[in-house]
């Protein structure tokens, strides 16, 4: 099938954009949006919310990028659906670039593990392909701990079936934080070094078993409140219908988290932060943009942020059109956020509120300090995460996200793109 007329000129430019077409048609799955409250969102550190999704599709050849549906949690949380076992038992999971393990609640969970009883649970007896492992694991997240045992079974994701993965059956989730989560578990997309018990991350397994062409994935997070869907996660490449080229590639400096070097941050014409350069992590598991306390305090002073409890800042909604842009210098290119990008508008008890998309987070040396570019940034810019291979190092590609329906007809057939 030939590409749409509007896409043909773009494909001619691919050699200049440092990408290459695969000739494969991209697979899409419809997504849905829901809107719970933000206080829970803060507790969850940006984990994603589930939705009713269609059954997972038929198997796809390894040379096709695979789309996994994401659903939006109050504009800054996204999640999708996977299947485990034979036949597949479906779970909603947060796709997290800041961790590397896959886990879901277990039917064998502890009686007093409240979060377990409020979510879908994996039943090993209901799967004909289940293989016991039994190794104990424990994962500590920013907002809670998960304990359980490792097991092995078949993974279904975005149409791919048959991947044999080792995953965690969560037996004990002592933190009530996960009780508030509208997702069941977490699928980590970080580097192997972050993986607990040396388990191969799901992305690595898909590549090693020939079900995925390259260890590359990209996120398009749709933050348009008028749209019912939350965007798409593309496994194996990226889709030019999601972004305005070119992609700017920035090398990963610490291959654990998706950490890169950020040259500067500017707030309007007058304030410069990260003046001597600093570390930044792109993290789909973080809702907001975080940075060192002193710099975030200065940023809020420049945009008129009024401090509230729990580190939140409120913005006067009437001032949004007058607020300065906040710009991030990455790979020699400025990535600008307007106030409409970084102010989160919500309604509480019938009252319209405007909340800042920036929050302070101090991480001491040697790991920190660093900024985290979470979903407020990733909702404006598509990110292509390229793990690299023996010939190339890991890197992240960034480009402005297209407005749904603009520039390319949304839903038209497009050609996949892979970082070169």
From Swiss-Prot:
Keyword check for Glycoprotein: yes
A Gene Ontology BP annotation from the UniProt entry: surfactant homeostasis
Highest taxon listed in the record's lineage: Eukaryota
The Peptidase A1 domain, residue ranges: 78-399
Cysteine pairs bridged by disulfides in the record: 109-116, 274-278, 317-354
Coiled coil feature spans: none
EC numbers for this chain: 3.4.23.-
Propeptide residue intervals: 26-63
Catalytic residues of the enzyme: 96, 283
Organ and tissue specificity: Expressed predominantly in adult lung (type II pneumocytes) and kidney and in fetal lung. Low levels in adult spleen and very low levels in peripheral blood leukocytes.
Glycan attachment points: 90, 133, 336
Signal peptide: 1-25
GO molecular function, one term: aspartic-type endopeptidase activity
Keywords: Aspartyl protease, Disulfide bond, Glycoprotein, Hydrolase, Protease, Secreted, Signal, Zymogen
Main location, first listed in the record: secreted
Pfam (any one): Asp
GO cellular component: a single term: alveolar lamellar body
Role this protein plays: May be involved in processing of pneumocyte surfactant precursors.
Name of this chain's protein: Napsin-A
Organism: Homo sapiens (Human)
Phylogenetic classification of the source organism: Eukaryota, Metazoa, Chordata, Craniata, Vertebrata
Gene encoding the protein: NAPSA
């Amino acid at each position: 099938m030939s590409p749409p007329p509007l896409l043909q000129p773009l494909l001619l430019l691919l050699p200049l954009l440092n990408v290459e077409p695969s000739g494969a048609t991209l697979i899409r799955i419809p997504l849905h949006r829901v809107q719970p409250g933000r206080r829970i969102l803060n507790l969850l550190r940006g984990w994603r919310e589930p939705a009713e999704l269609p059954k997972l599709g038929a198997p796809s050849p390894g040379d096709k990028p695979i789309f996994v549906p994401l659903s939006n949690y109050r504009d800054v949380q996204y999640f999708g659906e996977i299947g485990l076992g034979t036949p597949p038992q479906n779970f909603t999971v947060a796709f997290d670039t800041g961790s590397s393990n896959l886990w879901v609640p277990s039917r064998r969970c502890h009686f007093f593990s409240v979060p377990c009883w409020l979510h879908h649970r994996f039943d090993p007896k209901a799967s004909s392909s289940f293989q016991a492992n039994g190794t104990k694991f424990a994962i500590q997240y920013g907002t809670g701990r998960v304990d359980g045992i490792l097991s092995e079974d078949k993974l279904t994701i975005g149409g791919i079936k048959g991947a044999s993965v080792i995953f965690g059956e969560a037996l004990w989730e002592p933190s009530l934080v996960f009780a508030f989560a509208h997702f069941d578990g977490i699928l980590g997309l970080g580097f192997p070094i972050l993986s607990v018990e040396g388990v191969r991350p799901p992305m690595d397994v898909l590549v090693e078993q020939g079900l995925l062409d390259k260890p590359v994935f990209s996120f398009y997070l749709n933050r348009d409140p008028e749209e019912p869907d939350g965007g798409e996660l593309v496994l194996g490449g990226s889709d030019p219908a999601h972004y305005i080229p070119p992609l700017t590639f920035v090398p990963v400096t610490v291959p654990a988290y998706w950490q890169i070097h950020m040259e500067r941050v500017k707030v309007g014409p007058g304030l410069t932060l990260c003046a001597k350069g600093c570390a930044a992590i792109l993290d789909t598991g973080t809702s907001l943009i975080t940075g060192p306390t002193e710099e975030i305090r200065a940023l809020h002073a420049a945009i008129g942020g009024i401090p509230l409890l729990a580190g939140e800042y409120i913005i006067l909604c009437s001032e949004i059109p007058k607020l300065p842009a906040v710009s991030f210098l990455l790979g020699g290119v400025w990535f600008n956020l307007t106030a409409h990008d970084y102010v989160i508008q919500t309604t509480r008890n019938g009252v319209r509120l405007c909340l800042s998309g920036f929050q302070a987070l101090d991480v001491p040396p040697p790991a920190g300090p660093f900024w985290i570019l979470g979903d407020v940034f990733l909702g404006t810019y598509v990110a292509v995460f390229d793990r690299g291979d023996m010939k190339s190092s890991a890197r992240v590609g960034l480009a402005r996200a297209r407005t749904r329906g603009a520039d390319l007809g949304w839903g038209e057939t497009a050609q996949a793109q892979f970082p070169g």
